[in-house]
């Protein structure tokens, strides 16, 4: 676990019910009933996204038979990133990963308080409910989905929408940091408070 505070000398993250848990998973496909989780990572930030702590980044073992069922996009993407090799070499099961991550999260946020945060996070939540139900119960039932802001910005402020360029690395930890950066981008450029009544620029 690494403190990735943006400012040198910034205080460590204090356990707080307002802290946010950011999560990303890589899967063999899109159907939680037939596909499996192959990587999971978490990052906890404070409520203002100024302080962050990285949690476990885990490749989850799956059989060669399961990996062989992936479509070409998944085989190519996860092959290029090295994830398929990491999955084959891993001895971590879904239950192992869920236990490690729950133990890490409990040190930074009370159970049932943080929404699940990320991009298109409902998809991760579907897989977690299917394959890691005990970890899914750690989260509040709400989601904080950066994709909501993305879709609104795309329709209401297309110039701002085009200003954030994703790296599309498709590894769990990199995708989390990109989601946090994307939310900061929308906060600074899209979520602009209106001036109080009667106040002019």
Swiss-Prot record:
Domain Exonuclease: 20-183
Keyword Cytoplasm (UniProt): yes
Cellular location(s): Cytoplasm
One GO term (biological process): DNA metabolic process
Similarity-based family: Belongs to the oligoribonuclease family.
Purpose of the protein: 3'-to-5' exoribonuclease specific for small oligoribonucleotides.
Protein name (Swiss-Prot/TrEMBL): Oligoribonuclease
Gene that encodes the chain: orn
């Amino acid at each position: 676990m690494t403190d990735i505070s943006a400012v040198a000398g910034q205080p460590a993250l204090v356990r707080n019910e307002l802290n946010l848990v950011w999560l990303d998973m890589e899967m063999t496909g899109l159907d939680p009933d037939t596909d499996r989780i192959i990587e999971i990572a978490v990052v906890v930030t404070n409520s203002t996204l100024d302080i962050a702590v990285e949690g476990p980044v885990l490749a989850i073992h799956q059989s060669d038979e399961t990996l062989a069922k992936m479509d070409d996009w998944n085989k190519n993407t996860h092959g290029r990133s090295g994830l398929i090799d990491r999955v084959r070499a891993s001895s971590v099961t879904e239950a192992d990963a869920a236990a490690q991550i729950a133990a890490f999260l409990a040190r930074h946020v009370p159970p049932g308080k943080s929404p699940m945060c990320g991009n298109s996070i409902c998809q991760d939540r579907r897989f977690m409910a299917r394959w890691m139900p005990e970890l899914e119960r750690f989260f509040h039932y709400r989601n904080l989905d950066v994709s909501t802001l993305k879709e609104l910005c795309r329709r209401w402020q297309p110039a701002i929408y085009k200003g954030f360029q994703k790296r599309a690395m498709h590894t769990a930890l990199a995708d989390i940091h990109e989601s946090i950066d994307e939310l900061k981008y929308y906060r600074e450029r899209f979520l602009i408070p209106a001036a109080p009544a009667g106040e002019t620029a």
